[in-house]
Design a protein with these regions (language model features):
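Conserved alpha/beta-hydrolase "acid-adjacent" motif
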Residues: 16, 137-143
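Active-site catalytic motif of lipid deacylating hydrolases and related acyltransferases
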Residues: 2-63
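Short glycine-rich catalytic loops that host catalytic nucleophiles or stabilize transition states
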Residues: 37-41, 157-163
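A conserved short beta-strand
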Residues: 88-101
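Gly/Ala-rich beta-loop-alpha elbow adjacent to hydrolase catalytic centers
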Residues: 69-79
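Catalytic active-site module of serine/aspartate enzymes centered on a nucleophile-bearing elbow/loop
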Residues: 58, 169-181
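Short beta-strand/loop motif that positions the catalytic acidic residue
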Residues: 124, 129-132, 136
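Catalytic histidine-centered segment of alpha/beta-hydrolase-like enzymes
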Residues: 45-46, 162-174
Length: 181
């Protein structure tokens, strides 16, 4: 059985909000797949040192061939850890509505900032799929375009509707996960 890890977003109540995504996604995956949804220390308070420690340990402990689904600031945190040298043995990384934390972006003045040459710091050959809603009310879909420019190997999909929490049908995500797990 493939290990599935869902990394929640950042800010107040992000874990609670993202639990809705997990609760809608889990039944679509079938009985053989279970999403692990730990509360990552530091994400809700946007404390990079705490996030780096807790999420770094969580990623390190994943079994080979795991799939990570990460949302919003949690997705950016996973990307930053990978850029800093974390090397979990992932089968696939799914990023949902992540802010682009480059030093040249609106999200860049934080401890979560990426190196300018982001793609050069990521694990070679790691399949990455990024989904963003065109009507995201929190993180503009223009962030997805930044990722596409900085990580051209990643598949970038702009979805019509659903907002930041991907309200509505999640079959697209379930099918993609089942296709790689």
């Amino acid at each position: 059985m493939t290990a599935l890890l869902f990394v929640h977003g950042g800010g107040d109540d992000a874990y609670r909000y993202d639990k809705d995504i997990v609760d809608r996604l889990q039944p679509l995956l079938g009985a053989g797949m279970r999403i692990d949804f730990p509360r990552i220390v530091g994400l809700e308070g946007l404390d990079w040192d705490a996030v780096a420690h807790d999420l770094g340990n969580t990623l390190r402990d994943l079994p080979q061939g795991s799939v990570v689904i990460a949302h919003s600031v949690g997705a950016s945190a996973v990307v930053k850890l990978l850029a800093e040298g974390a090397r979990p043995r992932l089968a696939h990384l799914f990023l949902l509505a992540p802010p682009y934390n480059g030093t040249d972006s609106e999200w860049g003045d934080t401890d979560f900032a990426f190196p300018a040459d982001l793609a050069a710091h990521l694990p070679r050959g790691l399949p990455i799929t990024l989904y963003h809603s065109d009507d995201d009310e929190i993180i503009s879909a223009s962030n997805a375009k930044r990722y596409a420019a900085k990580i051209p190997e990643a598949e970038t999909v702009i979805r019509h509707g659903g907002g930041h929490q991907f309200r509505g049908d999640l079959h697209f995500l379930a099918e993609a996960i089942m296709g790689v797990a």
